[in-house]
Amino acid sequence: MQQHKQLVVILETAIIAAFAMALTYIPHTTGVSAIELNYGLIPIAVLAMRRGLVPAAWAGFVWGILDLILRGIGGGSVLNPLQGILEYPIAFTLVGLMGLTFASFQKAVRGSEKVKASGYAFAGIIIGTFAKYFIHFIAGVVFWGAYAPKGTNVWVYSLIVNGGSALFSTVLTIVVVGVLLTVAPQLFVAKDGKSFSTKAA
């Protein structure tokens, strides 16, 4: 039975990673050039609140590897091995930090405290998203500085691009997760109660 539950978590993690990758192909560039909406963060957020930090981190890692192979290398977004590792497996894995609020979220959602549950979910989303884009911000300064518009400070340019992407993606994810919490709260509660993170009280 225990092995079956673990298999279910692994399958959910793999499905979420694949779904996040699929969402990446939806056009997602907004007004200012290079600022993007990251739809893939939405399923990772759901998994983080449903299963915890470790499954979410693994889903992020797999998503990062897929994005590296399917888009990064072929799309010219990998300048060298160090930058590729930093901006794909590492940055995407950090999205799993959304699961830091898993235990508190589960306690709230199981107690039908929707306002508290929303607050914990939103806090986790902010942590995970900004952790990811902090890595992109550093990489933007170190590796992408030469591509900044002439006369533009590389720190400022990277902050605008990556900070803007983080902000837009965070707002999008919070809105969608908020709607899902209202219309389908059961989506965030695993029937088997299994996680590889801190257990809800």
Swiss-Prot record:
<comment type="similarity">
    <text>Belongs to the vitamin uptake transporter (VUT/ECF) (TC 2.A.88) family. Thiamine transporter subfamily.</text>
</comment>
<comment type="function">
    <text>Thiamine-binding protein that interacts with the energy-coupling factor (ECF) ABC-transporter complex. Unlike classic ABC transporters this ECF transporter provides the energy necessary to transport a number of different substrates. The substrates themselves are bound by transmembrane, not extracytoplasmic soluble proteins and transport it into cells. Binds thiamine with a dissociation constant of 0.5 nM. Upon coexpression with its energy-coupling factor (ECF) ABC-transporter complex EcfA1A2T in Lactococcus lactis subsp.</text>
</comment>
<feature type="transmembrane region" description="Helical">
    <location>
        <begin position="53"/>
        <end position="73"/>
    </location>
</feature>
<keyword id="KW-1133">Transmembrane helix</keyword>
<protein>
    <recommendedName>
        <fullName>Thiamine transporter ThiT</fullName>
    </recommendedName>
</protein>
<dbReference type="GO" id="GO:0015234">
    <property type="term" value="F:thiamine transmembrane transporter activity"/>
</dbReference>
<dbReference type="GO" id="GO:0005886">
    <property type="term" value="C:plasma membrane"/>
</dbReference>
<feature type="transmembrane region" description="Helical">
    <location>
        <begin position="85"/>
        <end position="105"/>
    </location>
</feature>
<feature type="transmembrane region" description="Helical">
    <location>
        <begin position="7"/>
        <end position="27"/>
    </location>
</feature>
<keyword id="KW-0472">Membrane</keyword>
<keyword id="KW-0812">Transmembrane</keyword>
<dbReference type="InterPro" id="IPR012651">
    <property type="entry name" value="Thia_Transptr_ThiT"/>
</dbReference>
<keyword id="KW-0813">Transport</keyword>
<feature type="transmembrane region" description="Helical">
    <location>
        <begin position="170"/>
        <end position="190"/>
    </location>
</feature>
<feature type="transmembrane region" description="Helical">
    <location>
        <begin position="29"/>
        <end position="49"/>
    </location>
</feature>
<keyword id="KW-1003">Cell membrane</keyword>
<comment type="subunit">
    <text>In Lactococcus lactis subsp. cremoris (strain NZ9000) forms a stable energy-coupling factor (ECF) transporter complex probably composed of a membrane-embedded substrate-binding protein (S component), two ATP-binding proteins (A components) and a transmembrane protein (T component).</text>
</comment>
<dbReference type="Pfam" id="PF09515">
    <property type="entry name" value="Thia_YuaJ"/>
</dbReference>
<feature type="transmembrane region" description="Helical">
    <location>
        <begin position="124"/>
        <end position="144"/>
    </location>
</feature>
